């Protein structure tokens, strides 16, 4: 595999006419990459972490949006970079931006983002302690969707950057 194709061409970015996106609408893989990258932008605004604790007949819930975390903010910037990379046929740039999004989505998937419950910050230990006394429902839906859409964008961008030809005719 020729890894030199995965080096973003920053000189070409400076010469682009940004008023005219050059996406190849006949290329299904490029369209899939574009849709996945746009979905990554949308999924940053979903709750990346939510918890619902039911103890002693009382229910309490909290959630944290992906955009309110440092990795969500960086993820938004990288997802927008991936969208721009796909729109302007800079697939190497889109690939690396999507790979960073995958890593950030994985971090968001695994983390207990600092939640505020009862006016104080809940830690992972608080949630584990609550699990001993009641039912705890933990969700990472936004981070999971961000992770998978970024992974799809990364794979499609990699295929486009390396020039792999896949005959996918959906029309």
Summary of predicted features, one role per range:
Residues 2-171:
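Compact integral membrane and secretory-pathway proteins
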């Amino acid at each position: 595999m020729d890894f030199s194709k995965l080096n973003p061409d920053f000189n070409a970015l400076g010469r682009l006419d940004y008023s005219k996106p050059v996406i190849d609408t006949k290329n299904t893989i490029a369209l899939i990459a574009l849709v996945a990258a746009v979905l990554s932008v949308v999924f940053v605004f979903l709750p990346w972490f939510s918890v619902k604790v039911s103890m002693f007949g009382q229910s309490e819930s909290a959630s944290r949006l992906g955009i309110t975390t440092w990795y969500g903010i960086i993820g938004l910037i990288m997802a927008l970079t991936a969208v721009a990379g796909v729109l302007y046929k800079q697939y190497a740039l889109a690939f690396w931006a999507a790979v960073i999004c995958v890593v950030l989505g994985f971090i968001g998937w695994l983390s207990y983002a600092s939640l505020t419950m009862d006016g104080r910050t809940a830690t992972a230990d608080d949630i584990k302690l609550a699990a001993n006394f009641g039912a705890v429902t933990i969700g990472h839906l936004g981070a999971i969707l961000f992770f998978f859409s970024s992974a799809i964008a990364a794979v499609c961008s990699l295929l486009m950057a390396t020039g792999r030809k896949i005959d996918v005719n959906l029309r």
